[in-house]
């Protein structure tokens, strides 16, 4: 079975890992980084993803960041006259990670385990699955981020019984889950969280502070200037990271705006204590779900054996201190908060392929599920923190005499009134035979699969007529839309590939022109006028082709010039060899001459010898 990669699709950064042997390995992207910014930029018809997209966020208005916050909604991004759904933007990030994995493995990748915040509802999970499909990935499993982190942490500790609290504060979401680990079983006891709280919010309090201070000093509101705001965002993110290691940082943004007297510069010193004061309400917001998770699991803080911190925002010292104070123990420092989720997803991929044995993952549904009943109330069928997959049925009846149909309004949430909860979908069971109210027996069944995705069935027990629905929220995509987006993604990938090839070809051709000019100059009188003229002619032909748009012509002219330069190089090489041979022959002759010694001779008189 082919490899199943693990992907942490994050709000600000994403990460991809694969199981090698028994160990999960994080795959570096082409820039050599282990995480990739979840940023997509559109420029001159080209799509760019990752660091290259993030770098142009200040100057390019067609840059999309933190799209994960809009998953499962009907939000759209309008770029260059075209609308993109959050699923399509996320698919571009996933496709980039898929390409990274394929380059590393040297093989096609089409299966993945993708993580989501534990507190993601059904619509958000379905949107994530759709994004994977658009990117050309078969999503084998959607698992919760804290659960994935616990898998990576506990893989080599299967012989120990532990209760672990995972505190996951990412770029845009916050989750806390409590798991019980033992004998290879990873059982989630409870989960809680806040889908609208993350590192972006910590950046925002710094941005608001900088805007306020600058306005006080200069009377200019930077929040109305889009380009200034992006510079502030980058500076705030950097300052937040700096303050995890130092107690004070300098924020310097020259020419941030202009006033009547000329350009204005922002120079502010931000201390860690000031940042902690600004972020205090956000940190306190993380404590309520933590207490809720403990309460739902029926545990006290003293029963927690280990605390695992996940997500880049847990590097903030005040966050670590708050967790330590609440739970009463130091957090575990043995995992990388940016990479541990992707590693856990890769382990789950190994479980699916059979490469990891004796590991069982028992996850839970984060929110209660039910339907609307008389009086606008919500009747819960499946309580939150129920282990999945699961199924639950309940029998209802009609509210009026001879009622021909019933509306099933499917809800997710914890509030008693239907209107205060999230609507997952609506459908109708029709053709109910005429009968007094309360007589028809309508059985409603909720089924949640291992990915946390809901299927609902309504059945008239009198006629056995059945109607079912796989929940499709208002933001969900139809199969036709997904197929169209898959096709678009493939075409874009092909177009991007062609564009890259064209850029590479033009760069190679430019380089060749320069090389030929240099070679002709260096050789001087060592080449014949005929060869020189031929090379010049082919070089000029290539330069002329480069000014046009005919790629095939550039390719042909480049090949012609390459042949000329090869022939020229061969001739020069032969000349050099001949010259070297002649030099060696001359040196040998000189040496032979110098080896002839002048001999002394004496004239011999034969007559005298005979005497």
From Swiss-Prot:
Residues 574-591 have a biased composition (Low complexity). It comes from the Bacteria. InterPro entries: ATPase_NBD, Chaperone_DnaK, Heat_shock_70_CS, HSP70_C_sf, HSP70_peptide-bd_sf, Hsp_70_fam. Residues 529-542, 599-611 have a biased composition (Basic and acidic residues). Induction: By stress conditions e.g. heat shock. Coiled coil: none annotated. Keywords: ATP-binding, Chaperone, Nucleotide-binding, Phosphoprotein, Stress response. Residues 525-548, 573-611 are annotated as: Disordered. Pfam families: HSP70. The keyword Nucleotide-binding applies. The keyword Protease does not apply. One of its GO terms (molecular function) is ATP binding. The modification Phosphothreonine is found at residue 173. Belongs to the heat shock protein 70 family. Acts as a chaperone. PANTHER family: HEAT SHOCK PROTEIN 70KDA. NCBIfam families: PRK00290.1, prok_dnaK. This is Chaperone protein DnaK. It comes from Staphylococcus haemolyticus (strain JCSC1435). The lineage of its organism: Bacteria, Bacillati, Bacillota, Bacilli, Bacillales.
């Amino acid at each position: 079975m082919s490899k199943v990669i693990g992907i942490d699709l994050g709000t600000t950064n994403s990460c991809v890992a694969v199981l090698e042997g028994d160990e999960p390995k994080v795959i570096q992207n082409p820039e050599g980084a282990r995480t990739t910014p979840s940023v997509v930029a559109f420029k001159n018809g080209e799509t760019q993803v990752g660091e290259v997209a993030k770098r142009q966020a200040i100057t390019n208005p067609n840059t999309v960041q933190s799209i994960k916050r809009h998953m499962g909604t009907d939000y759209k991004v309008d770029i260059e006259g075209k609308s993109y759904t959050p699923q399509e933007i996320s698919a571009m990030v996933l496709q980039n990670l898929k390409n990274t994995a394929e380059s590393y493995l040297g093989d096609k990748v089409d299966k993945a385990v993708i993580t989501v915040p534990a507190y993601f509802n059904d619509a958000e999970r379905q949107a994530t699955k759709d994004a994977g499909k658009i990117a050309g990935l078969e999503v084998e499993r959607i698992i919760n981020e804290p659960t994935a982190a616990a898998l990576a942490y506990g893989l080599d500790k299967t012989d120990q019984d532990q209760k672990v609290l995972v505190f996951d504060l990412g770029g845009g979401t916050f989750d806390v889950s409590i798991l019980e680990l033992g004998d290879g079983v990873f059982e989630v006891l409870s989960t809680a969280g806040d889908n609208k709280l993350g590192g972006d919010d910590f950046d925002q309090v710094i941005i608001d502070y900088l805007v306020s201070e600058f306005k006080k000093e200069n009377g200019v509101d930077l929040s109305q200037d889009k380009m200034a705001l992006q510079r502030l965002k980058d500076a705030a993110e950097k300052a937040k990271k700096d303050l995890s290691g130092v107690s004070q940082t300098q924020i310097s943004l020259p020419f941030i705006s202009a006033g009547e007297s000329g350009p204005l510069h922002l120079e502010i010193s931000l201390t860690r204590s000031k940042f902690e004061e600004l972020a205090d309400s956000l940190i306190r917001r993380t404590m309520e779900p933590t207490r809720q998770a403990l309460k739902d699991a029926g545990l006290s803080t003293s029963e927690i054996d280990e605390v695992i911190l996940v997500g880049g925002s847990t590097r903030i010292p005040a966050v670590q201190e708050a967790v330590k104070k609440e739970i009463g123990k130091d957090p575990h420092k043995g995992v990388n908060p940016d990479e541990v989720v992707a590693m856990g997803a890769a382990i789950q991929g190994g479980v699916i392929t059979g490469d990891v044995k004796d590991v069982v993952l028992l996850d839970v549904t984060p929110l209660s599920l039910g339907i609307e009943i008389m009086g606008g109330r919500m009747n819960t069928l499946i309580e939150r923190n129920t282990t999945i997959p699961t199924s639950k049925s309940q029998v209802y009846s009609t509210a009026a005499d001879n009622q021909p149909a019933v509306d099933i309004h499917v809800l997710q949430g914890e509030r008693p009134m239907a209107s205060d909860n999230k609507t997952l979908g609506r459908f109708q069971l029709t053709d109910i035979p005429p009968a007094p109210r309360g007589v028809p027996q309508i059985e409603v069944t909720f089924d949640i699969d291992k990915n946390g995705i809901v299927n609902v069935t309504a059945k008239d027990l009198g006629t056995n007529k059945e109607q079912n629905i796989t929940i499709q929220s208002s933001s969900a995509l139809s199969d036709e839309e997904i197929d169209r987006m898959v096709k678009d993604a493939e075409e874009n990938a092909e177009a991007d590939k062609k564009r890259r090839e064209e850029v590479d070809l033009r760069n190679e051709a430019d380089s060749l022109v320069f090389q030929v000019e240099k070679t002709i100059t260096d050789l001087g009188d060592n080449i014949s006028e005929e060869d020189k003229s031929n090379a010049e002619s082919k070089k000029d032909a290539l330069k002329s082709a480069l000014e046009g748009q005919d790629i095939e012509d550039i390719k042909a002219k480049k090949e012609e010039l390459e042949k000329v330069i090869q022939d020229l190089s061969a001739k020069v090489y032969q000349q050099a060899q001949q010259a070297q041979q002649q030099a060696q022959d001359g040196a040998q002759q000189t040496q032979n001459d110098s080896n002839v010694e002048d001999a002394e001779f004496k004239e011999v008189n034969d007559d005298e010898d005979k005497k």
